[in-house]
Amino acid sequence: LFHAPATQQAKIIMHVTPLSGISTEALDALLDDAFGRDRHLRTAYLLRKGMVAIDHLSFGILDNDICVVSIQCWPVRVQHADLILVGPVAVATDRQNSGLGKQLMHLMLDATTPQDPPMVMIGDPEYYGRFGFSSAGTGGWTLPGPWEPRRLLLRNSAMAELPAQGTLGPAD
């Protein structure tokens, strides 16, 4: 449970739940708020097309049954190497800079197991570097849509051997 500061009207209690426990409508409303209605045109959507989110690594934070923060993780691959695509990490616009996104990132990372493959994401290295993500090791990778190479980030804490080149895409 997360406890937000009490307001004059009511105390707000937020709780973390697996993403599978959040309605599609509530999640879509959050994603539209955080990224816009045209979010489906982004390259990250091509990477996870047809995939099902990884349940033990995908969460949301509910505030009075409204999803205000979510993180999703997806199975992807570069050549024959399995990876976990992290994202989207969505925070409602009225909750930006609240620390909830950071808390959910830590929760997701804590939920990883030694058997989980390395993680990749498209994001700001200045922000996600604090979680161990960097563009090191992704310079020879391509994506099925536009992207900025400096924003293709890898977290390979187990130092798994990964291909130097290849196209990132959905796991089969």
Set out the residue ranges of the language-model regions.
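Conserved beta-strand in the GNAT
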Residues: 60, 66-77, 82-90
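Short amphipathic alpha-helix that is part of the acyltransferase structural core
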Residues: 10-45, 53, 60-67, 152-153, ...
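Short, solvent-exposed loop/turn elements at beta->coil junctions and helix N-caps
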Residues: 44-50, 139-142
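Conserved acetyl-CoA-binding loop-helix of GNAT-fold acetyltransferases
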Residues: 86, 91, 97-110, 121
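Conserved active-site alpha-helix within GNAT-family acetyltransferase domains
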Residues: 113-148
